[in-house]
C-alpha cells in the first residue's frame, strides 16, 4: 500500500498564472496579471523598508492595526474583519470550514478557476451555473441551489470578463440562498466598479453573506499577498479558528496598512484606470475586436475564433507585449488585457492595428 491523497485532490489541475517573460525579450510589457501599472503607494514602499529592519520580531497575530485601518476607510466594524494571505487564503478557509464530503460548492461557468479547486480540496462537489452573455445569471444560480449547497462563490466584477451585476441583483440572490449556505462575494476587483460597495451592505443585511477583498490589484501589493474578508462575527470566529496564527508577515501588514491609508494614491489610480479602460475598449471596437463593457482593470478582447486569438497573442509577444490567454476559463477565442498606463494602451492598440492590417 502507498499513501494517497484525499478523493478529488488529483482531479485538480495546477493553476497557471499570467506569463512574465518572453524568450529573447529582457523587459516585456506585462499586461497578463491585472497588476497596478503604477506599482504601489510610495508610503507603502517606505513602510515596508522600515519594517524590514525588525524581521527578527514576530508579527501581530490579530492584525488589529490593519483591521482598524480597513474599517475606518470603509466604514466597517473592524471586529468583523479578518485578514489573510491574499483573499485566496480566506476563500480557501471558507471552503475548509463550511464545506465537505456530500456538500456542494456553486459558482458560475466563467468564474475564478480556483473555486473548483477550493471545492475539491474540501472534498465537496463543484457545481457550475451557466452565465448569460458572459455575465453572472442570478436565475441560473438560484435554479441550482439544493439542500446540499454550502457555498456560493460570485466574483463581482468577474474575472476574466470584467462584467458586473448590481446590488439589487445580488440582494435577490442573497434572499434566495438558504440560511444553511454562505454567499461569498469575491471582490478582488470591486474598487474598480464605480458605486459598488463590494457587498458590505448585504453583509450587514444578511447573516450568511461574506465579502472578500485583496490588496493585490488596486493597491499594487501582489508581492506581499494580503487580503481581507468582512462577515458576521460568527463567521469570522470560525475562520479565525482555522487560519494560522502568524499567517501575515510584519512587512505585509505594515505595507497594507500604509497602502489603505494613502487615499490620494488610490484615487489617482482609479481615475487613470477608468480613463485608460475607456481608451482600450474604444480602440478595440474600432479595430473590430469585440469586448464587453468592463468594470475592472482589464478588458476581455474577443476575436473571431481561437486561431485568431492565438495569432494575435503571438503577434503581441513579437512586439514585447504579454497578455493572458483565457482558454482555461472557457474563452478560447479571447485574450484578457490588463489596463496599463496611457503609453501602454497606445502600444497595445498600435500592435493590434498592425496585426489586423489597419494603417
UniProtKB/Swiss-Prot annotation:
CDD domains: AAT_like
Coiled coil: none
Keywords: Amino-acid biosynthesis, Aminotransferase, Histidine biosynthesis, Pyridoxal phosphate, Transferase
Protein's UniProt keywords contain Nuclease: no
Transcription listed as a keyword: no
GO biological process, one term: L-histidine biosynthetic process
Listed cofactors: pyridoxal 5'-phosphate
Involved pathway(s): Amino-acid biosynthesis; L-histidine biosynthesis; L-histidine from 5-phospho-alpha-D-ribose 1-diphosphate: step 7/9
Database matches in PANTHER family: HISTIDINOL-PHOSPHATE AMINOTRANSFERASE, HISTIDINOL-PHOSPHATE AMINOTRANSFERASE 2
Self-association and partners: Homodimer.
HAMAP family, per the entry: HisC_aminotrans_2
Annotated protein name in UniProt: Histidinol-phosphate aminotransferase
Organism: Roseobacter denitrificans (strain ATCC 33942 / OCh 114)
Taxonomic lineage of the native organism: Bacteria, Pseudomonadati, Pseudomonadota, Alphaproteobacteria, Rhodobacterales
Gene name of this polypeptide: hisC
Amino acid at each position: 500500500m502507498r499513501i494517497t491523497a484525499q478523493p478529488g485532490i488529483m482531479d485538480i489541475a495546477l493553476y497557471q498564472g499570467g506569463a512574465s517573460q518572453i524568450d529573447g525579450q529582457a523587459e516585456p510589457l506585462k499586461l497578463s496579471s491585472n497588476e497596478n501599472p503604477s506599482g504601489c503607494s510610495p508610503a507603502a514602499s517606505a513602510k515596508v523598508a522600515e519594517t524590514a529592519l525588525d524581521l527578527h520580531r514576530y508579527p501581530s497575530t490579530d492584525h488589529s492595526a490593519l483591521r482598524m485601518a480597513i474599517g475606518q476607510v470603509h466604514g466597517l466594524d473592524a471586529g468583523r474583519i479578518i485578514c489573510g494571505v491574499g483573499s485566496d487564503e480566506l476563500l480557501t478557509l471558507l471552503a475548509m470550514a463550511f464545506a465537505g464530503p456530500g456538500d456542494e460548492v456553486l459558482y458560475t461557468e466563467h468564474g475564478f478557476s480556483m473555486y473548483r479547486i477550493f471545492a475539491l480540496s474540501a472534498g465537496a462537489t463543484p457545481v457550475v451555473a451557466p452565465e448569460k452573455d458572459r455575465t453572472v445569471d442570478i436565475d441560473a444560480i438560484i435554479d441550482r441551489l439544493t439542500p446540499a449547497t454550502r457555498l456560493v462563490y460570485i466574483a463581482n466584477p468577474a474575472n476574466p470578463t470584467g462584467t458586473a451585476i448590481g446590488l439589487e441583483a445580488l440582494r435577490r440572490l442573497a434572499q434566495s440562498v438558504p440560511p444553511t449556505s454562505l454567499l461569498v462575494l469575491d471582490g478582488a476587483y470591486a474598487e474598480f466598479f464605480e458605486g459598488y460597495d463590494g457587498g458590505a451592505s448585504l453583509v450587514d443585511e444578511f447573516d450568511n453573506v461574506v465579502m472578500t477583498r485583496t490588496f493585490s490589484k488596486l493597491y499594487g501589493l501582489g508581492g506581499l499577498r494580503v487580503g481581507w474578508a468582512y462577515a458576521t462575527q460568527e463567521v469570522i470566529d470560525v475562520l479565525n479558528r482555522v487560519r494560522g496564527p502568524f499567517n501575515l508577515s510584519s512587512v505585509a501588514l505594515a505595507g497594507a496598512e500604509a497602502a489603505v491609508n494613502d487615499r490620494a494614491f488610490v484615487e489617482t489610480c482609479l481615475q487613470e484606470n477608468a480613463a485608460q479602460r475607456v481608451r482600450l475598449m474604444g480602440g478595440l471596437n474600432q479595430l473590430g475586436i469585440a469586448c464587453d463593457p468592463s468594470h475592472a482593470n482589464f478588458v476581455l478582447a474577443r476575436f473571431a475564433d481561437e486561431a485568431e486569438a492565438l495569432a494575435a497573442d503571438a503577434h503581441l509577444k513579437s512586439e514585447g507585449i504579454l497578455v493572458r490567454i483565457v482558454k482555461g476559463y472557457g474563452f478560447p477565442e479571447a485574450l484578457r488585457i490588463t489596463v496599463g498606463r496611457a503609453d501602454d494602451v497606445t502600444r497595445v492598440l498600435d500592435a493590434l492595428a498592425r496585426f489586423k492590417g489597419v494603417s
